[in-house]
Amino acid sequence: MEIKFERFHLESDLLSPLEGFQWISVPTEVRIDPLTKRRSRIITWGLPIKDKFDFSQMATESKGCFFCPESVFSKTPKFLKEIVPGGRIVVGKAVGFPNLNPAGTYGSVVVLCQEHFLTLNQFTPDIYEEGFSVALEIIRRTTAFDPDIHYWQVSQNFLLPGGSSILHPHLQVIGDPIPTNEMEWLLDASSSYYHRNRTLYWNDLIRIEKGLEKRFITSIGKVHWFVSFAPIGFNEVCGIVEGHSSITTLGKEEISSLAKGIVSTLKYYYDKNLNSFNFSIYSIFGEASYQLLIRMISRTPIQPYYLNDWTSFEVLQSELTSNIFPEELCREIRPYFP
């Protein structure tokens, strides 16, 4: 076993006008991901979030979108008949259909609910259970039609800072014959670790994190929730689904466990006056060295003085940043989980 938690402590010395030009030292911590060896920076200063944003005007002005109940069955695309004879897939209130502007070989949308807008504390496990059930059915039917599609992502982009042009809550389901960069990094590193150690990195990581009690949140069924040692985004929370590399093999229990963890994280975000987020599930068929991973991050919230959370560090230097020490985040978020 060779999991190492490496970090560098950096200090910047200056004479601060906020302290009468007295000497101060400002710390930054650089951490190295134990699997991918990617670096991330923990930067804890930033603009404070004072209050919750009032979305009433934004929600009213955009209501009646293509995803609302009166339009979703008349103004959204249909699947090819060879894939879904009925054109769309419906489970409860969740509706799945092809993306009119796909970002991959197979791009689909899953509308999560009939409500045009939800605050983060209004999402429920049932909403995600139905949404994931639709996503799974889309993937199963598509791969039956095209077996070469091994790489799938199930993601949510919520609000403008999260990259969503539509307020109405929805998922993105994207399948390709080639992996994304992140999938390839995870897969290559997991495979390399397995061949060196003859054990699964993900099982070893969870065992170590449980023992350390610093970043492990809890287990809900077979889904193990934790905070990444070297996060790639703000307030990052991760989940590993034990015994699965693909979302298509999940049963109702695993889907429910994922849904509960997502909703728990969103309630924490809400109490922190956050309102925008992303999550992504990295699903890879038939990879024995890999385990299904979900990552969630918050985004800089919509507020009167909006500050984008992606700077030249992230965009041009490929060095991602986080706004909170993972150990502190773990202590704060644990009570939100069942």
Pin down the residues of each PLM region:
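Active-site microenvironments that recognize anionic phosphate/pyrophosphate groups
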Residues: 1-168, 174-253, 265-338
